From Swiss-Prot:
Keywords: Amino-acid biosynthesis, Metal-binding, Methionine biosynthesis, Methyltransferase, Repeat, Transferase, Zinc. It comes from Actinobacillus pleuropneumoniae serotype 3 (strain JL03). L-homocysteine binds at residues 432-434, 485, 600. CDD domains: CIMS_C_terminal_like, CIMS_N_terminal_like. The keyword Methyltransferase applies. The gene is metE. The keyword Cytoplasm does not apply. This is 5-methyltetrahydropteroyltriglutamate--homocysteine methyltransferase.
């Protein structure tokens, strides 16, 4: 018989129940016991869904109140010493303080979990870190599930991945040196799990899909030789990429089974066909929302079944944490877009797909002929749908002129033409894009969406806000203005709603971090722009002022990265389609007299593949898609872009290759350190380094901004330096926004006068 198991389940509930309960708890509106009871009910529901789908085990230990890597920091005693908490007796309040900070300590840093849109809390390791086992989190969930009558498989992230994902703090050392102390702690935790009578323990080592240094790889043999002494079978789970290059190492590890991601890396299967133990085949996509073609999946699984027999397990490619909970609640989508609805599968539907596969493998395809037929019909309909495939778009992409993604003239010539008409002072000041979104603005948008506010009233509300934003910027004497983006709820959703080829769910939420969930748009078909999206707002804003108004768009790579993307054509093609659609908007803005246009790309770096060898290909198509988004603009139109991340050094040639006339970046928190990289690289175009951190309501002093600007002037020629905040101001309040910008403008004017002498 084939074994079915799940690597992990979403934690937040079908309708984000956990999120709302957490937030009420933080506001002191919910008692701790009520939060614990709700969490227990969610776990029981998750286990029941797995059991009802004929899973041979329910997975435990995957549920968390905030983050599974934070749970592991508690379980190994590796919580940051700076908090002064004891990991053995940590209260729920203290747990949340680690994640969210308190009056004395800032929160543990957060970063992306591999190349997903989930964020984990980064372990802080010090030379003198001492570990201490605390298996309570896992043991309690095992007992709870067993009490409900389930067969249980706990999951824990492995020691090498855990250590790799952390950062060294304090005195310089190599965190790898902590491994020999960490492994006995893991052994202690696993022993406690085995003592609960579990047959299998799943240990996740996704770091194996990265370019790990040789000493880390070499350590796997010794680490797992020690852990294998535990009185339970170990399933080593890899995901997010191929581990074929480590096949010899993995086959030699003294574990009892291996999980492979055959969705992300189907080609790796050939390297493991002679694997002598349990092989868990990750065949249902744990990261996207499309139904699988089950006949095709069986074409892969049936030969494996013949070879492995009882040793074949089936599973999703990775944890289902990255997919929404249940498609069945999307009644609106089913009504408005029944065709698309039939092509989708959320977590519960993916579990049901695995159940069908298990039945087919155990009793033959005829036992599930109806389900397989339904799956095939949906796959065929999707392959041939004219809702998805539009000949004119394929034609447009195919017929792009040879240098479509190149400006007419080099930057040195363009900037002269731009400066001539812009006539800006030295160190021009501007904003990144958004201004504070008041409750009134949010209410007006929501009421308009629900049909409770007429179009005329909605437009009047937006225009009133735009005028307010323009007047405030004039009073502050900023040089290049923005319209403030009052009409936008989200920088990707706004454009997705106005582009063809996108759809939206109502409950398609996935966890980003803690209680924060995101609802990515669904890119299901060829992308076009039926009509202008931003032109009237920018044009209206420009009509209110003699100053220069900047148009604001989200770039193609960010739209791609923050969406669920169709899987029937390459991501690179989807990205180019978005770029070409945006170029129509850019040219319309230019025609409307908006000749400074910002195309935001905060997610270019996030899209980098896990392995360095794949970077160039990605950066090439991402760069091309970005340049296509402004194809055809005149030399005197100034293209800006904005990016916010802390690491540029390794991708600077690609950033320069975007050929934006001005790039604004987030630099205030790193004390302008980033700029040195731009200077060393001799970055050729204009730069606007952020001079204050918008993530804090704190108003910077004139001295702080002056210090940052003087540092910037040391490495960037004054003629090429812009002055701006780190990021958009959407989440700030008006009071601090005005005060922050006032300081920024005053300091700039002071330095301007000094430089003019």
């Amino acid at each position: 018989m084939t074994t079915l198991h799940i690597l992990g389940f979403p934690r937040v509930g079908a309708k984000r129940e956990l999120k709302f309960a957490q937030e009420r708890y933080w506001r002191k509106e919910l008692a701790e016991q009520d939060l614990l009871d709700l969490a227990k009910a969610l776990r029981e529901k998750n286990w029941l869904h797995q059991a009802q789908a004929d899973a041979d085990f329910v997975t435990v230990g995957d549920f968390t109140f905030y983050d599974h890597i934070l749970d592991l920091q508690v379980a190994t005693g590796a919580i940051p010493a700076r908090f002064g908490f004891d990991s053995q007796t940590l209260s729920l309040d203290q747990y949340f303080q680690l994640a969210r900070g308190n009056k004395e300590q800032f929160a543990i840093e957060m970063t992306k979990w591999f190349d997903t849109n989930y964020h984990y809390l980064v372990p802080e390791f010090q030379k003198n870190t001492t570990f201490k086992a605390n298996s309570t989190h896992y043991v309690n969930q095992i007992r709870e599930a067993k009490a409900a009558g389930h067969q249980v498989k706990p999951v824990i992230v492995g020691p090498l991945t855990f250590l790799w994902l952390g950062k060294e703090k304090g005195e310089a050392f190599n965190r790898f040196d902590l491994l020999k102390q960490l492994v006995p702690i893991y052994f202690e935790i696993l022993t406690a799990l085995a003592a609960e009578g579990v047959e299998w323990i799943q240990i996740d080592e996704p770091a194996l899909a990265l370019d790990l240094p040789q000493e880390w790889l070499a350590a796997y043999q010794d680490v797992y030789a020690q852990l294998a002494k535990v009185n339970a079978k170990l399933l080593l789970a890899t995901y997010f990429g191929s581990v074929a290059e480590h096949a010899a190492l993995l086959k030699a590890l003294p574990v009892d089974g291996l999980h492979l991601d055959l969705v992300r890396a189907p080609e790796q299967l050939s390297a493991f066909e002679d694997y002598p133990k349990v092989l868990s085949a990750g065949v249902i996509d744990g990261r996207n929302i499309w139904r699988a073609n089950l006949n095709r999946v069986l074409d892969v699984l049936e030969p494996l079944k013949a070879k492995f027999n009882q040793r074949l397990w089936i599973a999703p490619s990775c944890s289902l944490l990255h997919t929404p909970y249940d498609l069945a609640v999307e009644t609106q989508l089913q009504q408005n877009n029944p065709e698309l609805y039939r092509w989708l599968a959320f977590t519960l539907q993916k579990v049901a797909e695995l159940q069908v596969l298990k039945q087919a493998l155990n009793a033959g395809r005829s036992a599930v002929a109806e389900q397989l037929n339904d799956s095939q019909t949906a796959a065929d309909a999707r392959a041939n749908s004219n809702v998805i495939h539009k000949a004119e778009i394929a034609q447009r992409l195919a017929n792009l002129p040879a240098n479509a993604d190149k400006r007419q003239s080099p930057f040195a010539e363009r900037i002269k033409l731009q400066n001539k008409w812009l006539n800006l002072p030295l160190l021009p000041t501007t904003n990144i894009g958004s201004f504070p979104q008041t409750l009134e603005i949010r209410h007006a948008r929501a009421a308009f969406k629900k049909g409770e506010l007429s179009l005329a009233d909605y437009e009047a509300a937006m225009k009133k806000e735009i005028e307010f934003v323009v007047r405030k910027q004039e009073e502050l004497d900023l040089d290049v203005l923005v319209h403030g983006e009052a009409e936008r709820n989200d920088m990707v959703e706004y454009f997705g709603e106005l582009l063809d080829g996108f759809a939206f769910t109502k409950f398609g939420w996935v966890q980003s971090y803690g209680s924060r969930c995101v609802k990515p748009p669904v890119i299901y078909g060829d992308v076009t722009r039926p009509e202008p999206m931003t032109v009237r707002w920018s044009q209206y804003a420009q009509s209110l002022t003699d100053k220069v108004m900047k148009g604001m768009l989200t770039g193609p790579v960010t739209i791609l990265q923050w969406s669920f993307v169709r899987n029937d054509i390459p991501r690179s093609t989807v990205c180019k389609q978005i770029g070409v659609a945006l170029s129509d908007e850019v040219l319309d803005l230019e025609k409307a007299g908006i000749k400074v246009i910002q195309i935001d790309e905060p997610a270019i770096r996030e899209g980098l593949p896990l392995k360095r060898a794949d970077w160039d290909a990605y950066l090439q198509w991402a760069g091309e898609a970005f340049r296509l988004s402004y194809m055809g603009v005149k030399d005197d139109t100034q293209i800006h872009t904005h990016m916010c991340y802390s690491e540029f050094n390794d991708i600077l040639p690609a950033i320069a290759g975007l050929d934006a006339d001005v790039i604004t970046i987030e630099t205030s928190r790193s004390d302008m350190e980033l700029l040195t990289a731009f200077a060393d690289f001799k970055y050729p175009n204009d730069i606007g380094p952020g001079v204050y951190d918008i993530h804090s309501p704190r108003v910077p002093t004139a001295g702080e901004i002056e210090h940052l600007l003087r540092k910037a002037l040391k490495v960037i020629p004054k003629e090429r330096l812009w002055v701006n905040p780190d990021c958009g101001l959407k989440t700030r309040g008006w009071k601090e926004t005005i005060e922050q910008l006032q300081v920024m403008v005053e300091v700039t004017k002071k330095l301007r006068a000094e430089l003019a002498e």
